[in-house]
Structures are given as structure tokens and as C-alpha cells.
Amino acid sequence: MNLHEYQAKQLFAEYGLPVSTGYACDTPEEAAAAAEKIGGDMWVVKTQVHAGGRGKAGGVKLVKTIDEVKAFAANWLGKNLVTYQTDEKGQPVAKILVESCTDIANELYLGAVVDRASRKVVFMASTEGGVEIETVAEETPELIHKAEIDPLVGPQAYQARELGFKLGLNPVQMKQFVKIFMGLGKMFTDFDFALLEINPLVITDEGNLHCLDGKIGIDGNALYRQPKIREFHDPSQEDSREAHAASFELNYVALDGNVGCMVNGAGLAMGTMDIVNLHGGKPANFLDVGGGATKERVSEAFKIILSDDNVKAVLVNIFGGIVRCDMIAEGIIGAVKEVGVNVPVVVRLEGTNAELGREVLKNSGLDIIAAESLTDAAEKVVAAAEGK
């Protein structure tokens, strides 16, 4: 789950990190009132969406009058912002962040992720702020400095100082950096972050460090113990099919292919997508129905898959470990009858009662294509999707 910039900065402020005075607004009038409340003669107005590249897409602007603030909000609220990180439809803009203007002398980068290789939280800092860190990692990796956080003792001030020296900070800035580093380290574990970025972390004209932007990703598996973070959830920023699937405990991710995939188990689902791709097909989705694949969940999964107009065939790949294949077969038959599937359906069953399951499908009288193996299933579904 991702947070909006204004939500990230709200958390930053609670942990004593330096952020701009700002207000998230729902209407042009509210945005104008926020600018007046902040004061001054210059403001930054930002569209709030779960995507980067807002500035290049016109979603961030420096304005000098209240009328400009109001016009920016009126122009964007209720519309979609399309950036290089969104699809062609873009993301809906429901809030505008109005902030005080910050004079920038230099831009740095500070971020943290859960590193699977070291199995620790790793902080990254760079003098190359304000640009995509992936670009820096690819072109000049020596400019990215890292600090691994020991989970037993947490972030340490000496680690912050080591990074600060590499960033060329002066003694005053070093103190500020240590405070920011320690606050972010505590915040990362307190709220079960998966990703954290301040890009840019700026040095102002007065020589102070300031968190100019904020990007936070939360570990979705930890939301059950994060009631405060759950309140930040914005379903408008998610694919409607993915949100609908989650309500039925289905793990669904929309893709851009034409072969719908319904599988039990995330690993098997990824393997299924790989073999479809290997045989010349393009998966339209990732969909894991989980271990308890009941008729109701299979039926809902079919509905979600078929809501994508690009789907020309569906591959159902079930391994009967926890559940019996004959029971799954009955669920598939019931779902096909209920939903009224009008594209070819290829089913591969393996595991407990697999032979019985295939027999149930064969005797159903429905136009369901049975597959003997995963390779056979992939070949048949790709051919079916191509109309062969």
C-alpha cells in the first residue's frame, strides 16, 4: 500500500522531521484559503497521486498569486494525471497539496528499503538528489552510499554521520541529518514500511536540511496491526479490479496480455505466466485464488478475469494439495455456468484426485479444454487465444 505525499509528510512531522507548512485540499476554494493561511507571496501546488513524474506532467507548479492556486486546483481536481509511471488512463486527482515555497541551494537523496539479500533495512544516500535513483544506480553507482540497519539494535547515530560525511555535510547539517536518519529509521519499523524515499532532501539557502518530498510504501501484510496507516488507504488510486479481488481474498494484478490466468498459489501463478509467455502468449493478469479455492471464489475470479476485454482465453491451473481436484472441477463447472464464459477455457489439474477432476470436467458437457500437463495447457491456451 502506498501513501500520498501529504500523508508521508504528516508522519514526518510527527517524528520531528523538517517539512514545509502545507495543507491537502479538496476544492479550489479550500486551496485558496490554505495559501492565504500559509502566507507569503509564493506557493507550490502539487497534485496528489500514487505516481512519480508529476512535475513533468504538469502536476506540480510554482505559483505567485491566490488566483493561480485556485486555477490550478480547479484544473486538476476530478481529473486524471498521466505520468510515465501510470497507464494511459492516469491516476485520479482528489486532493491538491498547497505548500510554502522553499529556497533550494542543493538537492540530496535519502531512501530506505527492505533488502532481501542482507535481510535488513538498508538506507541509501546520494548527492544526486532530484533525479530517479534507478538512473543514478545504473550510470554512477559509486555515488550511492549505503548503511545496513541491524534489526537487534536499530539505526545508530554513527551510521548517519558516516553517510553525512560522504554527502559533504557541515557540522550543523550533520546534526540535522542524524536527527532525520534516526527518525526515519524508527518510523520505518514502527509503521512496517517497505519503501521510503525523500527525493529531494534539500539544503536550503540558509544551509538547513529540509524534506521537500516524501514517498512511502507500506508492507501490505502488516496492515492488520497498523490501524493508523489503514486510515490512509486511498482505493481510488488502485485498479478497481484489484480492489474488488482483494475483497474476496484474491490476489489479482492486471497486466496487458490476452491470456487470463487463474491459479492457486503465488509461485505456481508466476510459473504459469512464465510458461504462457514462453509459448508465445501474453498473460492478461496474475491471479492467485489461494489454497481454499471454493466455487464462490473461482466464480468471482472468472468474473474479474473476464471484466478485461482483452482476454481471449482463460487458463485455469490448479494443484490439488490442500483441496481436492474433483471439488475444484465442480467449482469451475458451476462458475462457468453462472458467469456465462464466452471465451475458451483450458484447465490443467494436478494432485489429489486429479484424474477424477478431469473426468468430472469431461462429463460436464461444457466446452472446457482439458490439459494433461503444464506445457500442454500453455500450448492449448495460446492457440485458443489466437483463434486456432
From Swiss-Prot:
GO molecular function: ATP binding; magnesium ion binding; succinate-CoA ligase (ADP-forming) activity; succinate-CoA ligase (GDP-forming) activity
Residues at which substrate binds: 264, 321-323
Cofactor binding, per record: Binds 1 Mg(2+) ion per subunit.
Keywords assigned: ATP-binding, Ligase, Magnesium, Metal-binding, Nucleotide-binding, Tricarboxylic acid cycle
Transmembrane segments: none
Cellular component terms (Gene Ontology): cytosol; succinate-CoA ligase complex
Pathway info: Carbohydrate metabolism; tricarboxylic acid cycle; succinate from succinyl-CoA (ligase route): step 1/1
Coiled coil regions in record: none
Reactions catalysed, as given in the entry: succinate + ATP + CoA = succinyl-CoA + ADP + phosphate; GTP + succinate + CoA = succinyl-CoA + GDP + phosphate
Subunit comment: Heterotetramer of two alpha and two beta subunits.
Record-stated family: Belongs to the succinate/malate CoA ligase beta subunit family.
Role, per record: Succinyl-CoA synthetase functions in the citric acid cycle (TCA), coupling the hydrolysis of succinyl-CoA to the synthesis of either ATP or GTP and thus represents the only step of substrate-level phosphorylation in the TCA. The beta subunit provides nucleotide specificity of the enzyme and binds the substrate succinate, while the binding sites for coenzyme A and phosphate are found in the alpha subunit.
Protein name: Succinate--CoA ligase [ADP-forming] subunit beta
The organism of origin for this protein: Pseudoalteromonas translucida (strain TAC 125)
Name of the gene this protein is made from: sucC
